Protein backbone atom coordinates (compact mmCIF):
# COMPACT_ATOMS: atom_id res chain seq x y z
CA UNK A 1 0.00 0.00 0.00
CA UNK A 2 1.37 3.40 -0.95
CA UNK A 3 1.57 6.43 1.29
CA UNK A 4 -0.94 8.21 -0.94
CA UNK A 5 -3.49 5.44 -0.55
CA UNK A 6 -3.02 5.47 3.22
CA UNK A 7 -3.76 9.20 3.29
CA UNK A 8 -6.75 8.63 1.05
CA UNK A 9 -8.14 6.01 3.40
CA UNK A 10 -7.65 8.17 6.47
CA UNK A 11 -9.14 11.23 4.77
CA UNK A 12 -12.41 9.40 4.17
CA UNK A 13 -12.48 7.19 7.26
CA UNK A 14 -15.17 9.28 8.93
CA UNK A 15 -17.68 9.23 6.06
CA UNK A 16 -21.13 8.06 7.09
CA UNK A 17 -22.15 6.31 3.86
CA UNK A 18 -25.72 5.58 4.96
CA UNK A 19 -26.32 9.21 5.94
CA UNK A 20 -24.78 10.45 2.68
CA UNK A 21 -26.96 8.16 0.58
CA UNK A 22 -30.06 9.11 2.59
CA UNK A 23 -29.40 12.83 2.09
CA UNK A 24 -28.81 12.26 -1.62
CA UNK A 25 -32.06 10.30 -1.88
CA UNK A 26 -34.02 12.98 0.04
CA UNK A 27 -32.70 15.65 -2.33
CA UNK A 28 -33.32 13.68 -5.51
CA UNK A 29 -29.63 13.48 -6.42
CA UNK A 30 -29.99 9.95 -7.78
CA UNK A 31 -32.37 11.17 -10.48
CA UNK A 32 -29.40 12.70 -12.30
CA UNK A 33 -26.37 10.92 -10.79
CA UNK A 34 -25.36 7.34 -10.19
CA UNK A 35 -22.47 6.30 -8.01
CA UNK A 36 -20.78 4.52 -10.90
CA UNK A 37 -23.07 5.10 -13.89
CA UNK A 38 -23.75 8.32 -15.80
CA UNK A 39 -27.33 9.51 -15.98
CA UNK A 40 -28.25 13.08 -16.96
CA UNK A 41 -25.35 14.12 -14.73
CA UNK A 42 -21.95 12.51 -14.33
CA UNK A 43 -21.46 9.42 -12.20
CA UNK A 44 -20.04 10.35 -8.83
CA UNK A 45 -16.99 8.14 -9.30
CA UNK A 46 -16.16 10.33 -12.32
CA UNK A 47 -16.64 13.45 -10.18
CA UNK A 48 -14.26 11.93 -7.64
CA UNK A 49 -11.69 11.19 -10.34
CA UNK A 50 -11.97 14.74 -11.69
CA UNK A 51 -11.14 16.24 -8.29
CA UNK A 52 -8.49 13.70 -7.25
CA UNK A 53 -5.52 15.58 -5.83
CA UNK A 54 -7.37 18.92 -5.71
CA UNK A 55 -6.88 20.36 -2.22
CA UNK A 56 -9.97 22.54 -2.71
CA UNK A 57 -12.25 19.74 -3.94
CA UNK A 58 -14.50 19.75 -0.87
CA UNK A 59 -14.97 23.53 -1.00
CA UNK A 60 -15.62 23.47 -4.76
CA UNK A 61 -18.24 20.74 -4.50
CA UNK A 62 -19.93 22.35 -1.49
CA UNK A 63 -20.16 25.57 -3.49
CA UNK A 64 -21.59 23.67 -6.46
CA UNK A 65 -24.26 22.03 -4.28
CA UNK A 66 -25.25 25.28 -2.58
CA UNK A 67 -25.10 27.84 -5.40
CA UNK A 68 -27.73 26.72 -7.91
CA UNK A 69 -25.41 27.56 -10.82
CA UNK A 70 -26.36 26.30 -14.26
CA UNK A 71 -25.15 22.91 -15.40
CA UNK A 72 -24.97 21.76 -19.01
CA UNK A 73 -26.61 18.50 -20.06
CA UNK A 74 -25.47 16.12 -22.81
CA UNK A 75 -28.15 17.46 -25.18
CA UNK A 76 -26.79 20.99 -24.75
CA UNK A 77 -29.54 22.52 -22.61
CA UNK A 78 -28.75 24.14 -19.27
CA UNK A 79 -30.61 24.12 -15.98
CA UNK A 80 -29.90 25.46 -12.52
CA UNK A 81 -28.43 22.71 -10.36
CA UNK A 82 -30.78 21.87 -7.51
CA UNK A 83 -29.57 23.35 -4.22
CA UNK A 84 -28.88 20.72 -1.58
CA UNK A 85 -31.29 21.09 1.32
CA UNK A 86 -30.00 20.18 4.76
CA UNK A 87 -30.20 21.78 8.17
CA UNK A 88 -26.66 20.83 9.14
CA UNK A 89 -23.70 21.85 6.96
CA UNK A 90 -21.85 18.80 8.29
CA UNK A 91 -24.33 16.60 6.41
CA UNK A 92 -23.50 18.35 3.14
CA UNK A 93 -19.79 17.92 3.81
CA UNK A 94 -20.35 14.23 4.58
CA UNK A 95 -22.10 13.81 1.22
CA UNK A 96 -19.23 15.52 -0.60
CA UNK A 97 -16.68 13.37 1.23
CA UNK A 98 -18.68 10.29 0.25
CA UNK A 99 -18.65 11.35 -3.41
CA UNK A 100 -14.91 11.98 -3.26
CA UNK A 101 -14.33 8.57 -1.67
CA UNK A 102 -15.66 6.73 -4.72
Task: Indicate where each model-derived feature is located.
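Axial heme c-ligation environment in periplasmic c-type cytochrome domains
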Residues: 40-51, 64-96
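Protein kinase-like catalytic domain
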Residues: 33, 66, 99-100
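The canonical Cys-X-X-Cys-His
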Residues: 27-35, 95
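Solvent-exposed loop/turn segments at secondary-structure junctions
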Residues: 37-39, 102
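Bacterial N-terminal signal peptides
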Residues: 1-6
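Electrostatic cytochrome c docking/interface patches
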Residues: 8-24, 50-52
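Post-signal/leader-peptide non-cytosolic segments of secretory proteins
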Residues: 54-64
Amino acid sequence: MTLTSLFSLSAHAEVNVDAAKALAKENGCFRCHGTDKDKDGPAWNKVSAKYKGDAKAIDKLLEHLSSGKNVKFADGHEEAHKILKTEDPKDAKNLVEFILSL
